[in-house]
Amino acid sequence: MIRIGSNSRAPRRALCLVTTALVVFGGSALAWADGAADEALKAGIGLLKQGKSKEADEKFRAVLAADPSNQDAYSLVKDTDYRVFLEMLKAGGDAEQVAKRLLNLSNQVEVEKSKDPAAIAALIDTAINAKELDQRDMAARKLAGSHGQYAVPGLVGYLGSNDVDTRANAILALTKIGSDAVLPLAASIGTGNEMQKQNTIKLLQRIGDERSEAAIAKAMGDKAGAAQKYMAMAKKYFHGDQMTVKAFDRSFSIWTVKDGALVARDVPRFVYNYELAEQCAYDALALDPSMKDARAMIALTGCAEQVAFGNLSDEARANEGIAAQGKALEGVGAIAGAVGAGGLLDAFRLGAELKNGDAAAKVADAIPGVWDGRAIGEDNALVQGLTSEDNKIRYAAAIALLRISPAAAFPKSNMVAQIAGDAAASRAVRQVLVIDTDTKNAMNVQRALNQAGFHAVAANAGTEGLSMAKATGGFDAVVVSSKLSDITVFQVLADLGRDFRTSGAKKIVMAAGGDLGASKAEYDKFGLSGVAPTSTDSVGVVNMVKEALASPAGDSGRVHANWLSIAASNAIAGANSPAFNLRDAQKGLLAAAGPGADPDVALAALNALAKVANGDAQSELRGIISTASNPAAIRVAACRAMATALRGQTPSKETYDALLDAMGDADVGVRTAAGAAIGSGKLTPEQQAEVMTKRRVD
């Protein structure tokens, strides 16, 4: 997600390279708006070099206002040293936005050119039929370099040719395309004649890419083995494994056979890995209709895509292709419901296994609607979720069980109400990802953040962390160790910064003593929100995360946390089962309704307290009732909760006085609710007389 007005800057040394753009950006490159945008861009770069970021941003905004076309941007990018754009991206602010906009527009032209059927057909004709080897070789190289996977449909048929030279030339061209050809080749098996099939299998075996193993097993008659391989790949795709989802930032096509022809279906990149996982699950299900994991994966991927769409910025959702994908995702609920309670429980378990708490929570939300009354044992996925280290999964499991409200106690049912109360108290709680290959330190930091009230999860490798971060784009902050064993911290920071799903997250680096040493200048390029010292208690990390995430109300993290709090409160209010001790939720509900809570959050918590409150809640409820600045609806709800808390009990003097005062409030609703609350308690005759006398209606 792009953030306008960032204060982060690249060092002056790095910006020196940007001055080369003053020469490279010729008037012919930016022809739109009669060269005005060209001049604005050059001026902006010059000002950026001088450290005048505010003035530079004004020029960059003028460039965006000129609304460059795809072709304008493509011409510019082709004629410019890419390092210029890299430094603009690092500079932040509107320099970063201009660079992202131009690169994105240019990329759209690149993609269209890579699919150009006329260009592909001409090169294939040369690669297959030219008499000279060097001509065939050059054409094959151009197919690989400029068209990649999109050349496969035109080449694959030649693998079944009766002419040995034709087959050899096709194999040569496809071999040069290499791993980019794997997905369309694997999808094509079964089309064409037997010779084409066998040559396709041999070619895929020669390339040796794991993504084709399931298709090869299927082609060789091993249905059971193929189904298992498809599911193994589905899990890797779902997790966003960087070594599996190849060309993740370039290619977003799902290959299938339709009416005997190999066709590509383009998808937005934010769902690409999930769509690959879903296709594998459908392939597995076609081989084994009884495969539970396949049905679970189909339900899970749909929910994961819905979550990912919800985490996009408004700007991203306005994109035509992304908006269309969002519209299509409206049908996910029907598919998820169709797998039934058992299928959704499997999907919830799978989401937890794959460390996608957001998708698992989305699945859990659908389970009560299809609940079939089955017995709940220790092996139930929701019961197992109650002890998950991921708070999202714990909270989702508790909320779902409350909504189900089983007729009898079940394993760990005594934990449910308190966990739900904790979920209610999690209003405006932020999501934090910890990346550290030191497993012990990662666990310590995760635990400390969770104890401090954050939702924290940990990854024990840089690549795993990037996959988790991109899975939903829902993390408010990423804490990464300065020392990783698989990739460098700079690779992690750069990838987080340039991906639209993660660019908005605050980035915090953990380093010994909080000192980045000689590398500080390099770190400064990535717009860090802070540096924290490593320690056994992780206090420094927690404090730095708190500082980085101190932001105003209304942001996406607060909205998500408030939604969770309201869902938990509503589940507690609606629960109706002897399996739960709902008063265990009281502490969390009181925290949810406390100072600083948004009105809808407080109202939901107070409505739940009207069902579960006891005398221990008097002090907090009294404070809400007595605060005149609280909205009348909140004070009324607090009075109703107080009525429950006082039922059959003697109110404290402070509570009695507060309710008596509230009976004289200007708002009739508050007066009425306060009267009902004071009447629910055990009053002395003297108190009863005082109420009647002091609040007499003349």
Give the location of each predicted region.
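Short coil/linker segments at helix-helix boundaries
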Residues: 74, 79, 83-92, 236-280, ...
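Short hydrophobic/Thr-rich beta-strand motif most characteristic of the beta2 strand and flanking loop
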Residues: 453-461, 468
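Output/docking surface of receiver
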Residues: 510-548
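Conserved phosphotransfer microenvironments
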Residues: 477-496, 503-504, 511-519
